[in-house]
């Protein structure tokens, strides 16, 4: 049976990097006889410009019918003055909530070819391989009430609600424990249980879950210490599980340990295994249309999509090996060029990966 993939190029550099990932997918689709079909849709600023809203009903319907979604990026200064309710980022949040994509998997892997690109000394980051499991649909980003109000004295006050239910914590915990079982069996739960009651419950539920996974070593760490430890000794971590806001911050920090956020993919999954896959970086409007963005995170996101949602492990592994081979050849986009300064374009990098795949 054919598998349907929804392609959402989005904003900024999104269309450029997604185009290269699509070319790579076309190669493996033919090479491995995957039977994939592709549909494109609108989300974010591109959707606002066309339909007036960041997340059209048509996009949601197409996403619900698809087996997997590949997203470029959303947002940009063009839409910054819009009301919060209709900014491009609401399209991304709408996808996550509409498809119940509650689990975000963000690997932070340092390719040995890029050790010099890391902001830390090579001996600190050599062999780095961390997986951050972030809860996506709860916490302060979605809690209500929220808003800005005017007090009786005329002063404005902004407010948000930070809330997690036991069931939300438990389901993301299971994803993290099961991921740890398939890796080095170490899980660090990150919270702020010394201050926030929400994360007191978080810690209690993680401790309860640990009894069901006796082969996994569970530890706890406050988020401020975790941020410090990621810089001081990042290789102490195997799998990290945390809430929405903390995960948003820590995963970007971990990304920079690898040399460039342009190298890192991510997966957002629901309970049925349907996923949305996207690079960890943003829309980078400052370089949009200049053919200099790094497409590798998006290409690697496509590999994750093949692995987690489309049951095509061989094709996923082939893409990942092709990326490594291209790095071995010395090809670098500007963000990972290092001290040499020699770089190739978005298109050249994407074509190199596709060529390696086709020739193998």
Curated annotation (Swiss-Prot):
Tell me yes or no: is Manganese among this UniProt entry's keywords: yes
| Binding annotation for Mg(2+) | 224, 248, 252
Under Gene Ontology molecular function, one entry of this record is: NAD binding
UniProt keyword list: Amino-acid biosynthesis, Branched-chain amino acid biosynthesis, Cytoplasm, Leucine biosynthesis, Magnesium, Manganese, Metal-binding, NAD, Oxidoreductase
Sites where the protein binds substrate:
96, 106, 134, 224
Q: How does it assemble?
A: Homodimer.
What role does this protein play?
Catalyzes the oxidation of 3-carboxy-2-hydroxy-4-methylpentanoate (3-isopropylmalate) to 3-carboxy-4-methyl-2-oxopentanoate. The product decarboxylates to 4-methyl-2 oxopentanoate.
Instruction: Give the family, as the similarity comment puts it.
Output: Belongs to the isocitrate and isopropylmalate dehydrogenases family. LeuB type 1 subfamily.
Task: Supply the name of the protein.
Answer: 3-isopropylmalate dehydrogenase
- Gene designation: leuB
